Amino acid sequence: MSFRDRFQNLKETVGQWTDSSGGGSLDRKIERNLAEMEGGTEIERTAAVKALVIQAQTDDKWADPIITSFLRVLPDQLASPQEAIIDGLLELRKIKVSREGEIFESIQETLDSPYPSVRSKVVEIWTRFSLKSDTKTSDTIAVLFEMLSDDDKDVRYQTQESLSKILHTVPKVALPELKNAIGDDDWRVTYHSIVLLTEFAKKYPAPSVVLAPEVIEAFNSGERLKERAADCIGMLGLANPEAVKPAVPGLIKGLEGKSSELRKACATALGRIGSKNGMVVYHAVPRLARALKNDDWYIHVEVVKALGYIGSSKPALVKPHLAIIRNRTTTGADRNICKAAEWALKKAGGG
């Protein structure tokens, strides 16, 4: 059956169950829908839930019993009825404000739902909840950080996007939670948290620097996180080179790593740090010059730019290597390398 047919069936079923004409009182219709919500097919259950929401809004005496039934069956429902119940509970809390606490507690528990679509839905709800002016608490934000360890990639990336909104809206509340997340034992939580901090540091570098020790520790903890952590360290180094100085030996070592992406990220980070204080990265200059001589031309643009940035801060550090930079203005493996070398030569005082 096509999606359109399934949708039409659902629409017709809801219509049948909410139609006031036909046999039976409203009470019997509600009782039938409550039973169908637990024993019908997925489509029938979803339709029953939608009908019950309307019926609870129609007859107040049924609102509490229907909410209670929703809370009871929510954990064990299939994907579509779970989503329908969540939507229904959010609607019914408006008429039963006293039950808001248990409703949100029950919805939060569906973050453990076996269905990625449900988990994604709850992440979106929790994001809205976290951004409300009267509920900007670390507890709700901490729940979202836990979702960065979700087994489903789409859920993780949606959570990352949601946390980015929160981080940019309430940084004072979110940054302490981000700090904890960067130090999490689950590499996925750390990975996504570093990406979040990197983006945040581009706009708000000063408050981000306080997390430099955690990022450096992540960089040194294993290969899985090095590339992203190097990128973040470079951004933090633009704000405060001294804060990331402990990372420089690892970044230098990374220039000779197995991955071209890691070598490129380390070169970029060293250039960013060196653009603000060349002396912090002075040990890296000979290694960068050596990297221009190897066959991995994929990283040469970032390497030569790093030398240019460092040279703009401390020309004397790069002066012994101007010849290799000048050579790459004509012998670079592609035009981008040649142009980057020309730029670097001027920045370092050799052009």
Question: Where is each model-derived feature located?
Answer:
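Solenoidal tandem-repeat scaffolds enriched in leucines and small polar residues
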Residues: 147, 152-165, 169-172, 177-178, ...
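Eukaryotic acidic, Ser/Thr-rich intrinsically disordered low-complexity regions
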Residues: 323-351
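Eukaryotic tandem repeat interaction scaffolds
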Residues: 217, 222-293, 298
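N-terminal "cap/leader" segments of large eukaryotic alpha-helical scaffolds
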Residues: 2-46
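Alpha-solenoid HEAT/ARM repeat scaffold
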Residues: 46, 50, 64, 68, ...
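Alpha-helix N-cap/helix-start positions at coil->helix boundaries
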Residues: 42-43, 79-80, 116-117, 153-154, ...
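Amphipathic alpha-helical scaffolding segments comprising HEAT/armadillo-like alpha-solenoid repeats
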Residues: 24-35, 60-73, 97-110, 134-147, ...
